[in-house]
UniProtKB/Swiss-Prot annotation:
Name of the protein: Latent membrane protein 2
Organism the protein comes from: Epstein-Barr virus (strain AG876)
Keyword Phosphoprotein: yes
GO annotation, biological process: symbiont-mediated perturbation of host ubiquitin-like protein modification; viral latency
Compositionally biased spans, kind Polar residues: 27-41
Amino acid sequence: MGSLEMVPMGAGPPSPGGDPDGDDGGNNSQYPSASGSSGNTPTPPNDEERESNEEPPPPYEDPYWGNGDRHSDYQPLGTQDQSLYLGLQHDGNDGLPPPPYSPRDDSSQHIYEEAGRGSMNPVCLPVIVAPYLFWLAAIAASCFTASVSTVVTATGLALSLLLLAAVASSYAAAQRKLLTPVTVLTAVVTFFAICLTWRIEDPPFNSLLFALLAAAGGLQGIYVLVMLVLLILAYRRRWRRLTVCGGIMFLACVLVLIVDAVLQLSPLLGAVTVVSMTLLLLAFVLWLSSPGGLGTLGAALLTLAAALALLASLILGTLNLTTMFLLMLLWTLVVLLICSSCSSCPLSKILLARLFLYALALLLLASALIAGGSILQTNFKSLSSTEFIPNLFCMLLLIVAGILFILAILTEWGSGNRTYGPVFMCLGGLLTMVAGAVWLTVMTNTLLSAWILTAGFLIFLIGFALFGVIRCCRYCCYYCLTLESEERPPTPYRNTV
């Protein structure tokens, strides 16, 4: 019987599952080797030595080789719901999940990772090209009535946007995305370019031109609606219900802006409509890049800026019920975005404080822009050639300050970087102060000029506070620099073991 218990030399390791009789084959490897023993038959260890030398199995073997006592809730692969693996039916594995710890390829990150979808087919080219064809046909029909420069400008704009639409479509297909913000932006810009062509080519005298442009605008409007619906459906699992409501409200704002642009024939209101539409598009792209948290707060700030632009149109222009309704929609959208973002942010108090400071700076800058526009509009007819250049220079400084503020919002709330946003705000405050100081020097409407100077100073202080007083003290204060430069006394090493 002793010969039956001998382990032949050179034999391989036993299988981890053991013998069919129930003997644990892994315990044979704990016997001493034949070369190290004095006899041919090694002495098996007793129960205490066997328990002390026994090593626990690897973590990944425990669920699969266990007896079911410790893992009673573990469900074998054969009894799992087959609907979990419907996406793997055509992978040559008969719809079963891939075996554990044998990834399908080098790019697999999980043992049950579904096979990635192939590259998407690009968006149907006839759907993209159709409105552009109607648009180009309308431009060709206007050759007998419109000027050469108008026809050349409209044709170049149409071809450029058609090329941009093709690039956006190929980008969406290469990135395996159903829709991208670039595609939405291109479609909306195309729609407004068609409306602009309708305005500059005097269509009431040409019924064919009117029909072609109306067909092009209608097709592009339907395309925008379909893309937004597909975008909501594609991200319905990741986006919250409030975010989807925000997208629907954004679409309502776009429609109301179109109505406002059609009804208002004032150049001032047209320019303000273009500014507010640009801010809304930037807010929409920023919101798409980060549906929750910082991106949503930045979108709320840009939407608030668009609402202030429309409010400026109410102050400088005529009262319009459509614009008032749009302001209510934008204000509701701002509240929804702030509530949806702060509910998911752990540092909601800090973010709300920074949002409040940014909103306060936005109000100050908007008031400075309105005051500058009032100064320029009041003194435009009575200005001489020597006074026109300083006024235009100050107004350009205020416009650059507004652009810097938008860059600050996009930098901080889009990327989360808290350094460059306050720096841009400080620069905008300095430019506003320079504009107010120049207007105050030439004694042009002293009260408004003093307010512009004060608003610029307050914006600079807000940017300085957002940058951080402690950070500025650390970078500029001599005492703080001295403290940081001092070497700490070395602590003796004590071995207390």
